Amino acid sequence: MNERTLIQPDVEFINYLKKNGGDTVKECYQCATCSVVCSLSPEHEAFPRKEMIAASWGQKETLISDPDVWLCHGCTDCSTYCPRGAKPADVLGAIRSYVIESFAFPKFLGSAIKKPKYLIPLLIVPFIIIFLLLYNNLDGNFSQLNEGTVKFSRFLPHIIVEAFFIGGNILVFAFTAIGLSQFWKNLNNITPAANKKSFLGVFFATISEILTHKNFNTCSTNSSRFWGHLLIFYGFFGAMLTAGLAVGALFLYDMNPIPFFHPIKILGNLSGIALVVGCVVVAVHRFKTKDEKGSNTYNDWILILFVFLVAATGLLTETLRLFDTPFLAYNTYFVHMVFIFFLLWYAPYSKLAHMFYRTLAMVYLKMNGRDKKAAIFLNMLFITFFIR
């Protein structure tokens, strides 16, 4: 007699998916159209059909240990062609959000960052810290900032800013490492490769794919998202590189402020512009396609908003310094600092954490040979081309 398996759906998990963009999960009837049209679906154990089945049955443990969830880059080809409107891309996005929250350390921050009611309390933390540093530096005499030319080192010495920036980031990376180590240990739910590759053997190939955004540029219905994400990606890391170079220029060459046409300043300005433009492209795309292609969750918008605010206030701060308007320049700089610390200190808990989790998952998949594209997709493209 065949052995029976009792499946017990996790209703709370299903409700989480529905509240976080995956409200169409129950519309799926496993036709596998999503697996056929997905350009990233491997040859065997096709994705994302099996993930949609597991999600509709509330199989939480199966999904949080499934690296295939991270194959999806949100291009929404699957949602576009789904005959039932199940929007697999949104369901997978909700699953990834749950994974990040599950492995977050401390866990309560992973939950808080996704709820609008906690936005103000989370903002107040960096606000109070920076305000106290500023108050201590100025001995409570803020009126002195209205005198003389704009000089941010007088407002808040760079050594203090960098000490908290570096110290905070070390703590953030430590918390991130705890979550990622648990995530890595938990990855399974795929058939291991007979000749499993080494971690280092595939790590640099994975980084190369990320730098070129190769997997973002494979879908046929969502090209504008590729350019928006690419601008944000390089703008973000360009800004981080600028910050590091600026610290070196300050402490090694006492360069303060950095001249407007200096390469470091040019890199920073171009990065800021790339971030602003990228966020606008992504936001416009989301507004245009929200009904037919995908949902827009608070978790999505909070990241787009704060990346935009960090870049916009940074560029505005520089402009106000050049125009030598102390009151506006110092206040904008203060707000800019609050936004920066909010974005970076809460990175392991927001959607920004996907860059860490996706990278590890892609490495794991490559180690086990799960990065190969399905030949059926290439055949479908060929047929579709001639049908049209």
Feature map (PLM): residue ranges:
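Short, charged cytosolic
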Residues: Y81-I100, K197-L211
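Secondary-structure capping and boundary motifs in well-ordered enzyme cores
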Residues: E27-Q30, I64, L71-G74, N269-G272, ...
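Membrane-embedded alpha-helical bundles of multi-pass integral membrane proteins
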Residues: F103-F386
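N-terminal extramembrane/targeting module of integral membrane proteins
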Residues: M1-Y29
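Non-heme iron-sulfur electron-transfer modules
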Residues: M1-E12, S41-D68, G85-G110
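Short, well-ordered alpha-helical packing segments
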Residues: M52, V69, T76-S79, L92, ...
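Cysteine-centered iron-sulfur cluster-binding motifs in ferredoxin-type domains/subunits
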Residues: G22-P42, D66-A86, I95, N379, ...
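Active-site-adjacent structural elements in folded domains
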Residues: K18-D23, S65, T218-C219, T325-F327
